[in-house]
């Protein structure tokens, strides 16, 4: 079972801590308090990290050599409170040795459909889409 705590620091700043005591700063998006991530964008980071973890793990189990992976996650929200996400798109940029488009597509699909708990949690109410870009070493764009 997952467990986390969120502790108020000051103004609209908080520290989130997981069960192994790793922490992240969370804050409001305005400049005065903007030292941490917005909670809604932390959700996007969580989704990207969850699926990136799976993709790397799956490809490494297939003995593929990865040189680079980053996931660009973009979410669309309703325009009124409580501003739920309605659609989230993930764009994977990946480079490595001996990677085929089939290998990458299969790893991403398995992550979203079988392994990523964040995807599974969001899927019933949020449209999740993804694509990927398989690049040669040194050709990937900066995150």
Language-model-derived ranges and their functions:
Residues 53:
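Short glycine/serine/threonine-rich phosphate/pyrophosphate-binding segments
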């Amino acid at each position: 079972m997952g467990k986390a705590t969120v502790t108020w620091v000051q103004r609209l700043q908080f520290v989130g801590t997981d069960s192994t005591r790793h922490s992240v700063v969370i804050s409001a998006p305005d400049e005065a308090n903007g030292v941490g991530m917005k909670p809604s964008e932390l959700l996007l980071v969580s989704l990207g990290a969850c699926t990136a973890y799976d993709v790397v793990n799956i490809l490494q189990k297939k003995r593929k050599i990865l040189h680079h992976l980053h996931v660009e996650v973009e979410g669309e929200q309703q325009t009124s409170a409580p501003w739920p996400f309605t659609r989230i798109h993930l764009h994977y940029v990946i480079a490595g040795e001996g990677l085929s488009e089939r290998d990458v597509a299969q790893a991403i699909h398995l992550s979203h459909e079988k392994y990523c708990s964040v995807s599974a949690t969001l899927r019933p109410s949020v449209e999740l889409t993804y694509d990927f870009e398989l690049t040669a070493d040194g050709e990937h764009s900066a995150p």
